[in-house]
Amino acid sequence: MTIGRMENVEVFTAEGKGRGLKATKEFWAADIIFAERAYSAVVFDSLVNFVCHTCFKRQEKLHRCGQCKFAHYCDRTCQKDAWLNHKNECSAIKRYGKVPNENIRLAARIMWRVEREGTGLTEGCLVSVDDLQNHVEHFGEEEQKDLRVDVDTFLQYWPPQSQQFSMQYISHIFGVINCNGFTLSDQRGLQAVGVGIFPNLGLVNHDCWPNCTVIFNNGNHEAVKSMFHTQMRIELRALGKISEGEELTVSYIDFLNVSEERKRQLKKQYYFDCTCEHCQKKLKDDLFLGVKDNPKPSQEVVKEMIQFSKDTLEKIDKARSEGLYHEVVKLCRECLEKQEPVFADTNIYMLRMLSIVSEVLSYLQAFEEASFYARRMVDGYMKLYHPNNAQLGMAVMRAGLTNWHAGNIEVGHGMICKAYAILLVTHGPSHPITKDLEAMRVQTEMELRMFRQNEFMYYKMREAALNNQPMQVMAEPSNEPSPALFHKKQ
């Protein structure tokens, strides 16, 4: 295997993990360790008409490719930038007569690039797609069946005039996608819109309490001169001080679960046994399953309440999928009432309920009640998450907005400031989310100052402003969680 070179990091053999990356210099919180453009990336099947196929921004009006009628772009700039990667895809779709699923499209794009450039390492690339882990040998019976279907479909889609690859190599690429696919989000970071392969990122090992985070940046093509454009990329950012020689890690999954469940999830999705400190020592497990102290409920009562919470979550998922949001609120209220005397405020079953009910009530514009639940949710999250966790920052931001809409100006402003401080580390000052949050911070600070000077006049102006302004910050509730870092084929 050929290993490339890159400033700031180097490949090494991590004990018990295989390959990994370590820092070659010292880093501090918010430092960008490296940025990487996608080797190949595609939009999810369900969003191909709503998301630009170049920068992955969600837009209302998109330009459609006049030949295949499939690809969509923000403008001519994005369409021109996409042509190198879309050219083969365009003719293949026309020949095949239909559009294959996202996995097939991504595999084809990867192999067209291999055909075009070979598998040698380019500048700044540490590893080729040929040398990424595929874990095909660990696939279960169902996964092997899905793989055979994908390979068969790929062979029908792949043009006969293109370079022909072996079945083993095609299977390897599908395995790479399965294990190394990175979720791409829209420009607001609120919705997963696609999946991409970033070879250097594939070398960064997992830790449930990592020292880095990965953020997707859609880039910016708004400047008139192309020399000022920035490209779509991922950024590996430091969450705190990282010493020279220290291994760089990210979390492949959400931390908010007990260690055994996280280990089970990692084994199922990524085929390894997590040996991080938090899993080995079961750190914070007592908080995740926390119960009230005085009086302390019996083990039998706790067991029954956990099962009741799981059953209620299933009912909630069904109601949400059917758009029955008032039913969701009713189920959450009933469950929280029963959880209250049993679970502590950090219990994951209570936090899941608080998250759902605050989100749905915000969507229904019942902001006063939503703000109460959102504050409780944030209080629990702050005791569990890493202080610079991106998901914590997003949750605090949403809670701050909910409280602002409820008229809790001081609480809302405080939360927005806290979220802004976190996102400066995890996303950086130039990310669209951080820019939006900075605008909100300035606005709430101005309103807070006005509120303290003349409360009566403030409420008159606020009422007038809200009546003339459509809601833009509360999206329709979704069964999908916040976008996960790494994409797992459903």
Swiss-Prot record:
Q: Name one GO biological process term.
A: positive regulation of myotube differentiation
Provide this UniProt record's keywords sorted from A to Z. Cytoplasm, DNA-binding, Metal-binding, Methyltransferase, Nucleus, Repressor, S-adenosyl-L-methionine, Transcription, Transcription regulation, Transferase, Zinc, Zinc-finger
CDD domains linked to this entry: SET_SMYD1
Q: Where does Zn(2+) 2 bind?
A: 65, 68, 86, 90
Q: Where are the zinc fingers (MYND-type)?
A: 52-90
Subcellular location per UniProt equals: Cytoplasm; Nucleus
Q: Which residues form a coiled coil?
A: none
| Ligand binding (S-adenosyl-L-methionine) | 17-19, 135, 205-206, 270-272
Question: Residue ranges of the SET domain?
Answer: 7-253
Question: In terms of one coarse class, where is the protein primarily found?
Answer: cytoplasm
Entry similarity comment: Belongs to the class V-like SAM-binding methyltransferase superfamily.
Query: What do we know about how this protein assembles, alone or with others?
Result: Interacts with HDAC1, HDAC2 and HDAC3. Interacts (via MYND-type zinc finger) with NACA isoform skNAC.
Q: What does this protein do?
A: Methylates histone H3 at 'Lys-4' (H3K4me), seems able to perform both mono-, di-, and trimethylation. Acts as a transcriptional repressor. Essential for cardiomyocyte differentiation and cardiac morphogenesis.
The entry's free-text remark on domains says:
The SET domain is split between the S-sequence (residues 1-49) and the core SET domain (residues 181-258), however the two segments still come together to form a conserved SET domain fold.
Its recorded name reads: Histone-lysine N-methyltransferase SMYD1
Q: Which species?
A: Homo sapiens
Phylogenetic lineage? Eukaryota, Metazoa, Chordata, Craniata, Vertebrata
As recorded in Swiss-Prot or TrEMBL, the protein's gene is named SMYD1
